[in-house]
UniProtKB/Swiss-Prot annotation:
Gene designation: atpH
Transmembrane segments: none
PANTHER family reported for this sequence: ATP SYNTHASE DELTA CHAIN (PTHR11910)
Protein name: ATP synthase subunit delta
Alphabetical list of NCBIfam families matching this protein: ATP_synt_delta, PRK05758.2-4
Similarity section: Belongs to the ATPase delta chain family.
InterPro entries for this protein: ATP_synth_OSCP/delta_N_sf (IPR026015), ATPase_OSCP/dsu (IPR000711)
Record's signal peptide: none
GO terms for MF: proton-transporting ATP synthase activity, rotational mechanism
Membrane-related topology note: Peripheral membrane protein
Entry superkingdom: Bacteria
Subcellular location per the Swiss-Prot or TrEMBL entry: Cell membrane
Length: 179
């Protein structure tokens, strides 16, 4: 685990604990998702927030103006990050926090690679089958197009890969023939 992810993980876990204690897990989840989208959409704001020439107080004022409508506890958390010069971790913290929420809810993210876009019915069927395999209640599936697969699908859930693509089957056959 990289040091950045380790640091972000500690902050995300602490925030998650506070959210559970205050029954704000879903509120923080929504607000962090919106906050991350805003940070991704406005790189100039991120540059200002991470600019070392700005004082802590200036950064807090900037954050206060931009994040005025978020939950006060979450705003205080952002101030804490600024105080500790960790504002550049905000996006990663949001990701780790969301993973904790998903773990709590029994939800996992899955990337499904196919040659053509899959229908809603196909995605639902894959979700049902692989959610059961992973002991999850639900999978959030992202369908990616990969023409190199030739056919079939490849499902990636965390570190697990289920490859039922024609490309892999042909490679397996080639290996068996050469053996």
């Amino acid at each position: 685990m990289s040091k950045d992810l380790e640091v972000a993980g500690r902050y995300a876990n602490a925030l998650f604990q506070v959210a559970q204690d205050k029954d704000l897990v879903d509120v923080f989840s929504e607000e962090l998702t919106e906050l991350k989208a805003a940070l991704n959409a406005n790189k100039d704001f991120v540059k200002l927030l991470e600019n070392p020439t700005f004082t802590t107080e200036q950064k807090k004022n900037l954050a206060s103006a931009v994040f005025e409508k978020i939950n006060p506890t979450l705003r205080d958390f952002i101030y804490l990050l600024i105080d500790r010069s960790r504002e550049d971790y905000l996006s990663v913290i949001a990701d780790v926090y969301q993973k904790r929420v998903n773990d709590l809810r029994g939800v996992a993210d899955a990337d499904v690679y196919s040659v053509v876009p899959l229908s809603e019915q196909e995605l639902t069927a894959l979700s049902r089958v692989f959610a059961a395999k992973m002991n999850k209640t639900k999978l959030n599936i992202q369908n990616h197009i990969d023409k190199s697969l030739l056919g079939g699908v490849k499902v990636v859930i965390g570190t697990r890969i289920y490859d039922d693509s024609l490309k892999t089957k042909l490679k397996d056959m080639e290996r068996q023939i050469k053996a």
